[in-house]
């Protein structure tokens, strides 16, 4: 019996989806540069070793497809959190505090731990490799609309940071969060955990507090608190 054009297209979409899922896992485990498209095809159980190139044109297209599949969910969640933060602040007749904006940035990523999968690990690999491959710098979650919007709001709440300093801290924030989440996710997935790994709620709150501290820390020696350990008297 001949297959219909609709059936062929559906099969093609299913194959492409399998390739994307396999690539996300392999890239999260080993890094984008270390994985070949042939390995992706094999992991997707495809006998066609060129299937990734056929559907996505190459590794860059495949990475973009992973982001296109995952980023909209994070984008919508972050937009919802921003709206809620704005509503709370409007009721108090004040701007959204910088602390709340930092949380809006990263809570959707933290929630990925509840969904399983490998996207946070994938983002951690992208963050680590972005300086070696120029096109990678445009592909992580920071390219989504809600991330840019919240980042712009946060920059205005932190006038003590010039543009360069703000971008540097934001990049450090992304690396800290996705790297820590990837390590936590791997530890939880192993079933054995890690030495000293506490409850998820404590982990989440500690990560949020660390993120807020990173973005809101004062700059320059004149702004250091002399009571802090390790600072000159």
Where are the regions a protein language model picked out?
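Short hydrophobic clusters on alpha-helical segments that form packing/core surfaces
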Residues: 19-27, 211
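Amphipathic alpha-helical packing segments from all-alpha helical-bundle domains
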Residues: 100, 118-121, 131-158, 167
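An amphipathic alpha-helix adjacent to DNA-recognition modules
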Residues: 16-21, 33, 56-83
């Amino acid at each position: 019996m001949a297959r219909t054009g609709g059936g062929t297209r559906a099969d093609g979409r299913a194959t492409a989806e399998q390739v994307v899922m396999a690539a996300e896992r392999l890239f999260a485990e080993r890094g984008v540069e270390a994985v070949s498209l042939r390995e992706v095809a094999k992991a997707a159980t495809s006998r066609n070793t060129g299937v990734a190139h056929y559907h996505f044109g190459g590794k860059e297209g495949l990475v973009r497809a992973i982001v296109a599949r995952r980023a909209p969910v994070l984008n919508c969640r972050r937009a919802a959190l921003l709206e809620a933060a704005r509503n709370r602040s409007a009721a108090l007749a004040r701007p959204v505090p910088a602390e709340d904006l930092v949380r809006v940035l990263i809570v959707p990523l933290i929630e990925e731990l509840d969904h399983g999968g490998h996207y946070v690990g994938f983002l951690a690999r992208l963050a680590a490799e972005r300086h070696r491959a120029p096109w990678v710098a445009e592909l992580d979650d920071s390219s989504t609309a809600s991330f840019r919007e919240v980042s712009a709001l946060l920059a205005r709440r932190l006038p003590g940071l010039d543009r360069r300093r703000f971008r540097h801290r934001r990049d450090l924030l992304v690396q800290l969060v996705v790297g820590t989440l990837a390590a936590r996710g791997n530890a939880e997935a192993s079933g054995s955990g890690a030495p000293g790994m506490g409850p998820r709620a404590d982990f989440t709150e500690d990560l949020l507090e660390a993120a807020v501290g990173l973005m809101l820390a004062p700059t320059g020696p004149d702004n250091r608190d002399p009571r802090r350990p390790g600072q000159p008297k």
